Amino acid sequence: MPAKGPLQSVQVFGRKKTATAVAHCKRGNGLIKVNGRPLETIEPATLQYKLLEPVLLLGKERFAGVDIRVRVKGGGHVAQVYAIRQAISKALVAYYQKYVDEASKKEIKDILIQYDRTLLVADPRRCESKKFGGPGARARYQKSYR
């Protein structure tokens, strides 16, 4: 058990489409849970690897001193996974900036951005709204001349 001191924690969110994941990162011993369940229980396995990307990129030793708990809601399965991985990455960067040192935070940030920018920067694309005169955002109803 770590020494009892002031509570060191950061709260960060990750977003993708309508999915929002809120990550609480505090001093601990390497626990990462999503909605109260460990990452290993996420199905299917391909999406599980997407979630593990930040851990695999940075190595387990960087996550060893922190516990990350993520709550996620909204969106579909894939959007939720992308929101979670963004929240985990941003939480670690924020924790290192606030409680560790700037150099290691910059190192982590550079590794993540070099691999995939969406790990730290939200994707601004949203669904375009439907307009009148057609069944969707851009498609028009069929026109008949006779």
From Swiss-Prot:
One of its GO terms (biological process) is translation. Belongs to the universal ribosomal protein uS9 family. Component of the small ribosomal subunit. The gene is rps16. Component of the small ribosomal subunit. The ribosome is a large ribonucleoprotein complex responsible for the synthesis of proteins in the cell. GO terms for molecular function: RNA binding; structural constituent of ribosome. Disulfide bonds: none annotated. It comes from Heteropneustes fossilis (Stinging catfish). It is found in: Cytoplasm. This is Small ribosomal subunit protein uS9. PROSITE patterns: RIBOSOMAL_S9. InterPro entries: Ribosomal_Su5_D2-typ_SF, Ribosomal_uS9, Ribosomal_uS9_CS, Ribsml_uS5_D2-typ_fold_subgr. It comes from the Eukaryota. Keywords: Cytoplasm, Ribonucleoprotein, Ribosomal protein.
